UniProtKB/Swiss-Prot annotation:
This is Bidirectional sugar transporter SWEET7b. It comes from Oryza sativa subsp. japonica. Residues 31-45, 91-101, 153-165, 211-265 are cytoplasmic. PANTHER family: RAG1-ACTIVATING PROTEIN 1, SUGAR TRANSPORTER SWEET1. Pfam families: MtN3_slv. GO terms for cellular component: membrane; plasma membrane. Gene3D superfamilies: 1.20.1280.290. Mediates both low-affinity uptake and efflux of sugar across the plasma membrane. It is a multi-pass membrane protein. The gene is SWEET7B.
C-alpha cells in the first residue's frame, strides 16, 4: 500500500513543476522591457508582493518552523530567485522615481522579514507556535496575491471580453492551486490549504467567465468607415458679372450681364 507521505511528496513535486511555470510566465513582459530599455506602464508592485510572499513561505517551510515541508522551501526558494531577477531588470530600466519607490518597498520588506524571523525564533520556542505565527502571515499575504485576478475579472464582465485574461494562465493557476490544496490536505496543513483553496476558487471563476465571454470578444471597429452617400442634385446658380461700357451685349449697352450656371452637388 502506498503511504500518504509518498503520495504527498509526489503531489508536491508536481506542484513544484507547475509553480515553476507560473513563476516564468512574466518572462515575455521582461523581454519586452529589455528590448525597449524602458518599463513603460508596467508596475513593479506584483513582483514586490510575490517576493515577500516567497520569503514568508521559505521561512515557514524551514525545519525550525514547520518540519517536513521541504517542497514548500524548494519552489518558493526558486521563486524568490526569479522574482529577484525580475526586480533587478525592472530597477535597471526604471526612472528615478520608480527606483526610489522600489528601494523604499524593498527596504521595508527586508526590515519586516528580519522582525518576523527574530520575533519568531526568539519569542516562540515550539514548532506549533512558530508555525501558527508564520502561517497566519503566509495566509494573509498569499490571499492578497491570489485575489489579484479579481481586478481582471471585473474588467472581463464590464467589457464582455477575455482579451486580457489568457486562458492558459487561468488553467495553470487552477491546476497549481488544486495541486497544492491536495498536498496540504493529505497531512492537513490549514495554512497552505486556505490561500491555495482560494486560488482554486478564483481560477475556477476565471474559467467560468472565459466560457461565458470567449465568443463575445468585441471586434475592433474598422477605421475606414463608409460615409453615407448623397444623390447629386442639380442647382441653377446665377452669377452677375460687370460689363464694360465699351462692350456690346446683344447690340445694346449694358452695365451687367447675368450668366446661368448649373452646378451638380
Amino acid at each position: 500500500m502506498v503511504s500518504p507521505d509518498l503520495i504527498r511528496n509526489m503531489v508536491g513535486i508536481v506542484g513544484n513543476i507547475i509553480s515553476f511555470g507560473l513563476f516564468l510566465s512574466p518572462v515575455p513582459t521582461f523581454y519586452r522591457i529589455i528590448k525597449n530599455k524602458d518599463v513603460q506602464d508596467f508596475k513593479a508592485d506584483p513582483y514586490l508582493a510575490t517576493l515577500l510572499n516567497c520569503m514568508l513561505w521559505v521561512f515557514y517551510g524551514l525545519p525550525i518552523v514547520h518540519p517536513n515541508s521541504i517542497l514548500v522551501v524548494t519552489i518558493n526558494g526558486i521563486g524568490l530567485v526569479i522574482e529577484a531577477v525580475y526586480l533587478t531588470i525592472f530597477f535597471l530600466f526604471s526612472d528615478k522615481k520608480n527606483k526610489k519607490k522600489m528601494g523604499v518597498v524593498l527596504a521595508t520588506e527586508a526590515l519586516f522579514m528580519a522582525a518576523v524571523v527574530l520575533g519568531v525564533l526568539l519569542g516562540a520556542h515550539t514548532h506549533q507556535r512558530r508555525s501558527l505565527i508564520v502561517g497566519i502571515l503566509c495566509v494573509i499575504f498569499g490571499t492578497i496575491m491570489y485575489s489579484s485576478p479579481l481586478t481582471i475579472m471585473s474588467q472581463v464582465v464590464k467589457t464582455k471580453s477575455v482579451e486580457y485574461m489568457p486562458l492558459l494562465l487561468s488553467v495553470v493557476s487552477f491546476l497549481n492551486g488544486l495541486c497544492w490544496t491536495s498536498y496540504a490536505l493529505i497531512r492537513l496543513d490549514i495554512f497552505i490549504t486556505i490561500p491555495n483553496g482560494l486560488g482554486v476558487l478564483f481560477a475556477l471563476m476565471q474559467l467560468i467567465l472565459y466560457a461565458i465571454y470567449y465568443r463575445t470578444i468585441p471586434k475592433k471597429q474598422d477605421k475606414n468607415l463608409e460615409l453615407p452617400t448623397v444623390a447629386p442634385v442639380a442647382k441653377d446658380t446665377s452669377i452677375v458679372t460687370p460689363v464694360s461700357k465699351d462692350d456690346d451685349v446683344d447690340g445694346g449697352n449694358a452695365s451687367h450681364v447675368t450668366i446661368n450656371i448649373t452646378i451638380e452637388l
